Amino acid sequence: LDLEDSVTPADKAAARTYLKDFLSKVESKKRISLRVNELSSAFAKADIDLICGFNPQPLSSVILPKIHNLDDVKSWAAKLPAGMELEVQIESAMGLIQAPHIASHPQVISLAFGPADFMASAGMPSSNPGTPWPEVANALQWPLMQVVIAAHAHGKTAYDGPYFQISDDLGLS
């Protein structure tokens, strides 16, 4: 489930209301993860209040976007229910450099590479429309492998981000 990029700012409150209703009816045996808004955003407190308002807790994990360092993870962990599993998105140059430290947190169960925000953060050429996809994909291999290595060094799962060339059936497969 997502409260971040897939929900416009104007629709955040309505999305939370819908999720509160939906999650209150969900069977506890289901594995459910929720991506929240960045901690520094105006929307994070309401996301935290939503999550902390459940008893029993229907969420298995919380997906944390735009994590830049271990302190970001610690801040989230302190605000969420005790022991909540955290899935961290590495979406910035600083997050990439700090990925091994981020992965060391005991509540972190996975690292995911977020290529779009990462490219913007790193000033990569793919943030310019028209950059050929093979050039972009090649440029993303090194940071992606750093996320994979950081995750696996700490016994965590690593995920790649979305594949943007959805009309490329061969590449998408």
Q: What would you call each of these model-derived segments?
A:
Residues 1-173:
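Expand to "…catalyze enediolate/carbanion chemistry for C-C bond making/breaking, isomerization
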